[in-house]
Amino acid sequence: MLGASGVQIGTRFLVAEECDIPASYKERVIKASDIDAVVTGRSTGHPVRCLRNQLTRSLQKIEKEGGSEEEFNKLGVGALRRAAIEGDMQTGSVLAGQIAGMITKEQTTEEIIQELMLGVKEKLNLQVNGINA
């Protein structure tokens, strides 16, 4: 069977009831659209995917205009803390993957894992049925 050998699902678990981040962070992920996840930091060799906000627009402008790494880093210092601890959704680094636009509600970790396992079972059944056809 060909396909993925693993999954990376951090964004989904950010919105788990058990995740201890500010409600504003969870809300931002839930309200994200399919085009809100952007990458910054390519010019520094440290790309990061976050949800679009005032910080990402400023960082992207620096990169587009060929600003220095020092200028870039000055804006980024403490940005994750501002988002994940202080709940600042404008000048904080709201880390999230491309999947953010598909997350619509807060769930328990158990519910998330059950949904994932159901998806795996469905895919495996399709593979087995395809082989037996």
PLM regions: where:
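Conserved active-site-proximal phosphate/metal-binding subdomains
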Residues: M1-A133
